[in-house]
Amino acid sequence: MVLKYLKALTSSNDNLEETLLNVYLERKQNFEIFENRSSLVKQEIEKLSSSPSTIQISTSDSDNNHYSITFSSGYGSGVICKRTGMFFNNSLGEIELNPQGFLGNTYSERLISNMSPLIVSNKESIYALGSPGADRISTALAQVIYNYINNNDWSTAISKPRFHVNQNGSVRAEPESIEDNKNVTFTNANDMYFGGVCVTGINDDVVAYGDKRRGDINWTN
């Protein structure tokens, strides 16, 4: 979905909001298996007093190894695939994607995940990146990659204001991210709603970039 959002951002379509909404609806219609998702999610949310949080860890070293993982508290199978270092997911237990509960109506069906840990590269460098943020993960990553393509600076790409088009066509946006209209609800700048993209990689040296929306955590040694 990140690639679909990125394609929408780079298209020449004059109505960007409509294009992004169509991507969202394509995801819902073709990749989500529950027609009653909206009402079931609402019921489950009302039952919850709190929800677990998602973390993104991006790591790179001077030997050109790169690692990206997006993980939620209370989720995951606890099993790593041999010789790969990859965790098996357990999206069957993710309420947003499977509101009917663990193993509910999933036989022979393919479940999606909002999580999008990425390894991206250009001719000079390789980078690991990802973000928490539920269904804003794809749009946050697409916008950051789009910004990087335009300015070749990860710090600037991460800090630029973001917006997200919801299923109903409404838009939540940080100031100066999109033109104001009747569909837009503006948040504060650097709102954690829009994820927390973190990037590591190698330029001339190992680099790391955090996101002010989620604590701006980064460390190099």
Protein language model features and the residues they cover:
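Internal maturation/activation junctions in enzymes
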Residues: 1, 5-72, 81-84, 184
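Short, solvent-exposed loop/turn segments at the edges of secondary structure
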Residues: 52, 81-83, 112-115, 136, ...
